[in-house]
């Protein structure tokens, strides 16, 4: 059996190159048998597979690299990594909660302070509503600093459940390995890759959204109790009992459809726009080495500037698309608190909506589909209708 035998090449140490090297070395030493030199380089018999039953070689498969059992730094540390993500997410959620709290109160139309007269960039007199900082100071005056964190507990639980759900889905349905496609000649392959990745992200986002939405509803209702100074929803367990008793199982999923639609539109819009911009407007020949010779003489710097531009493109597209999908977020949050027995979900703050489409049409007529999208410069529009106190 020669070194070039296809049955030996996959498992023999060194393969054909090792056997050829043995022959060359034997010839240099004056005719020593090549087989002796080859046997001297072979591993001990205890570690050598039978030639007719070769032992399968260890493959650096995607499962090991993705965090499967036995993966260095991933398989055994997966629970630790997931717990770290949950902890970091909880910290970010807690820090950003006052911002979202004020935003929700503005979304439901609660304006406890009257607008003030100011001038715009053209010098015209306009009415401005209080900014985020002024609104936050008002909440501190009424409820103290701890009042800025009303409804934080169910929101922390919602985000943690969403993170754990996404991590579990990645283990059960691991994503396929994708190759980096950046050439305009590979547009079909690249577009298929984007569609496949976006479909996978959409599946994870929709499932995690559905599982975490009941806690999101509880968090929203806990926060809007500030409007009427109610205490109907005080804890997670008691809130679950109240919602189930008054509204049934569907009460936990009010406002879910606009949130899901917003997530789907955001994912597809952001990924497809970023893909087409990167494919048609970003030049792969851009190099950061002098003279434009970096791609041949320094492969490590190949497409470095193009890759940097691509990374920023998706970020910018995310901001732009999130502005376009904001009405879905607004309608979903309003439906979560509408007609639930709280003052913020009843007239004069809001009519009782029959469906999320009814809510959308009402806000569109009032010119309020982007209410709460800006927290710094909030100008009173001509069609605004607020319940001022």
From Swiss-Prot:
SUPFAM superfamilies: Mitochondrial carrier. The keyword Mitochondrion applies. Residues 1-78 are annotated as: Disordered. Residues 15-33 have a biased composition (Gly residues). The chain crosses the membrane at residues 94-104, 156-176, 210-229, 255-279, 323-342, 372-389. The modification Omega-N-methylarginine is found at residue 29. This is Mitochondrial carrier homolog 1. The lineage of its organism: Eukaryota, Metazoa, Chordata, Craniata, Vertebrata. The gene is Mtch1.
